């Protein structure tokens, strides 16, 4: 592989529970009549715009944006309330240093919004290896994570077919495979990743 495209949430930083708690609060504000817990499959992978459209199709564009910003504020607050969990996954720094030493270009392609990217650069030592301005994030111009992968490869000037994609969600891995990623590596918080392997991840 000639380049590596790194996801962040759920791969470099195990934060699924914080996202889940924040989305759950948003969901039950929008659906106070529903006592059931939020299905994790509804929020893992798609960008905020898609999640909110599915969750509350009656909201207009401005309301969806406000909803997205509120969800991320809740998420960051939950992260700060749990400082013991606010660290990179074991091996993440070693991976980035190893890629740097070998001259293999790598980049973050995250479904996070800009405010979260700023939060990550403030909270983790990733600035040692990555430039914030190079990060591909959810700025509202990408239809899905697959488009983010392709943009990340373009920024590195490497064909997507020669890129390794490191992801944790079924949706993102499915898109990476469909778009012809050279290699897909699945990393996740759960020990059993058989569902991701079946999709073509290593």
Q: What role is predicted for each listed range?
A:
Residues 164-202:
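Acidic, Mg2+-coordinating phosphoryl-transfer loop and its flanking beta/alpha structural elements
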Residues 11, 18, 114-115, 171, ...:
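Conserved Rossmann-like nucleotide-cofactor binding loop
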Residues 143-170:
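Conserved Lys-Pro-Asp/Glu-containing loop-to-beta segment of HAD-superfamily phosphomonoesterases
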Residues 2-90, 102:
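N-terminal helical cap/lid subdomain that shapes the substrate entry/recognition surface
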Residues 28-30, 55-58, 93, 97-107, ...:
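Substrate-recognition/cap helix-loop segment adjacent to the acidic, metal-dependent catalytic center
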Residues 22, 51, 116-119, 175, ...:
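Phosphate- and divalent-cation-binding pockets in alpha/beta enzyme and binding domains
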Residues 39-44, 69, 128-143:
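A short, structured active-site edge motif that brings together acidic residues
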């Amino acid at each position: 592989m000639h380049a590596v495209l790194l996801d962040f949430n759920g791969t470099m930083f195990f934060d699924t529970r914080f996202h889940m708690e924040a989305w759950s609060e948003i969901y039950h504000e929008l659906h106070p009549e529903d006592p059931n817990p939020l299905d994790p499959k509804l929020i893992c992978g798609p960008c905020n715009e898609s999640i909110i459209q599915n969750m509350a199709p009656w909201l207009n564009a401005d309301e969806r944006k406000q909803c997205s910003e509120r969800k991320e504020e809740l998420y960051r607050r939950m992260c700060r309330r749990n400082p013991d969990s606010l660290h990179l996954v074991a091996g993440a720094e070693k991976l980035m240093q190893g890629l740097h030493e070998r001259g293999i270009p790598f980049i973050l392609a995250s479904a996070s919004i800009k405010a979260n990217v700023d939060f990550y650069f403030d909270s983790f030592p990733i600035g040692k290896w990555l430039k914030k301005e190079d990060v591909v994030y959810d700025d509202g111009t990408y239809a899905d994570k697959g488009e983010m992968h392709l943009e990340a490869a373009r920024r590195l000037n490497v064909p997507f077919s020669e890129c390794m994609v490191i992801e944790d969600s079924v949706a993102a891995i499915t898109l990476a495979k469909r778009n012809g990623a050279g290699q897909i590596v699945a990393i996740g918080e759960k020990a059993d990743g058989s569902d991701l392997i079946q999709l073509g991840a290593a």
